[in-house]
Amino acid sequence: MPMSLGNAFIKNFLGKAPDWYKVAIISFLIINPIVFFFVDPFVAGWLLVVEFIFTLAMALKCYPLQPGGLLAIEAIAIGMTSPEQVKHELVANIEVLLLLVFMVAGIYFMKQLLLFIFTKILLGIRSKAILSLAFCFAAAFLSAFLDALTVIAVVISVAVGFYSIYHKVASGKGVSSDHDHTQDDHLAELTREDLENYRAFLRSLLMHAGVGTALGGVTTMVGEPQNLIIADQASWLFGEFLIRMAPVTLPVFVCGLLTCFAVEKLKVFGYGAELPDNVRHILVEFDKEERKARTNQDVAKLWIQGLIAVWLIVGLALHLAAVGLIGLSVIILATAFTGVIEEHSLGKAFEEALPFTALLAVFFSIVAVIIDQELFKPVIDAVLAVEDKGTQLAMFYVANGLLSMVSDNVFVGTVYINEVKTALVEGIITRDQFDLLAVAINTGTNLPSVATPNGQAAFLFLLTSALAPLIRLSYGKMVIMALPYTIVLALVGLFGIVFLLEPMTAWFYDAGWIAHHVGEATHAVSGGH
């Protein structure tokens, strides 16, 4: 019996998503205007934030762009925010958007070099705990100089490479033949068990790398986008930022690596999966075949990619241009010197990041609602009202951490540093207290936010990437796997803020490593940014 037109509309709405999910989204769309107009705009704002987090949590059922986008469009239509404010948010975050558009595509053209290096690491280190430490440390080191999103893009492209090599051979095809690694139909039962273990193995490595980006990203002013904003407000340069953060970031870094080692050894929270022998064998064979088949042309490509990688790190560490523009230069150099000149070959590189870029634009429209409806104001006011300076530092760290778990840490960091800047300009706090609070804000936004994928853009990118469903990495799984790290990073960070920050900073002043700032540096950024 043919489907009626009404049923066809319902069937088409959000496609293959389960019916309960469709009903949930439709009911959100009906409830929001009612709450906004007849109950309280503030309540409606928080309701929208919770609903948006729900769409992120269900990313494996339906990509969050569609449901989240519908919620955002309705929010703008009923006046929770304005198109101007959304545009203002996008303009303020243009560097992050450029980064996603160009840098992630640039990394795509560095794939051969990355696979070459990481295959050596993966096959060279037999111990899973040491391998995890290597991934975590490498991600942390890179994130101190590059953006966390760039580092995660590198790790994702490597993991997809590894996954597809094994999947191809397990499906009975040669290493070099074309293959769709998203379909499991051709696998025998024996290889399925290996595949599950291999997925668990890749999941744990990706989570270690993800947390690594947070460990490294908090230490320097180029590590995360909000660090730049905070450094700019406080007029700190690279060296001073590093030193001022050290009392908190160094203990956290050491404890983070210890946690990485511990969860692998104890095999808890979904960690501890070893690389199955069959898979190792296939990867070793792949490496041998690659070495045999490598022509001078391939070697030349690896050299070119190596030189471009050097330019990438130098360009980013010295901030020679906006991150996205350096990414664009990587695309141009890599394609020009490796001979990729057809338009359709270029298009593939952009497939991974553009859906996420669109999702981030929707995310910023939710942020615009948070700003216009002043959703965080009660929390911020309560913390600024605390008289005792030491308590105020701890409260700032905790409040920042909690808000960063539900909202984007770039946004939370920006809102807080603006409020504190305003307090400084109005003479409510001293310049020295402002400098200490800036450390509390930076560490508060960067460390506890590993708890959920909405806190860290790098985690969100990983969750919504094409790789996540392949290795069965869901929102809930990420939260559970991040839990030991969340607890350790948040508590050690708090310990650093309460007990180490003030005495260490005083010692740095006495030693002449940093100097007291006078006056209020630059004026607070306008609006939400």
Swiss-Prot record:
Keyword set, alphabetical order: Antiport, Cell inner membrane, Cell membrane, Ion transport, Membrane, Sodium, Sodium transport, Transmembrane, Transmembrane helix, Transport
UniProt membrane topology term: Multi-pass membrane protein
Cell wall biogenesis/degradation as UniProt keyword: no
Predominant place of localization: membrane
Superkingdom to which the source organism belongs: Bacteria
Listed GO CC annotations: plasma membrane
Keyword Cell inner membrane: yes
Location(s), subcellular: Cell inner membrane
Gene Ontology MF terms: sodium:proton antiporter activity
Parts of the chain that traverse the membrane: 13-33, 34-54, 90-110, 113-133, 136-156, 205-225, 241-261, 306-326, 327-347, 351-371, 451-471, 479-499
Catalytic activity: 2 Na(+)(in) + 3 H(+)(out) = 2 Na(+)(out) + 3 H(+)(in)
Family: Belongs to the NhaB Na(+)/H(+) (TC 2.A.34) antiporter family.
Function: Na(+)/H(+) antiporter that extrudes sodium in exchange for external protons.
NCBIfam families on file: NhaB, PRK09547.1
UniProt-recorded name of the protein: Na(+)/H(+) antiporter NhaB
Organism, scientific name: Vibrio vulnificus (strain CMCP6)
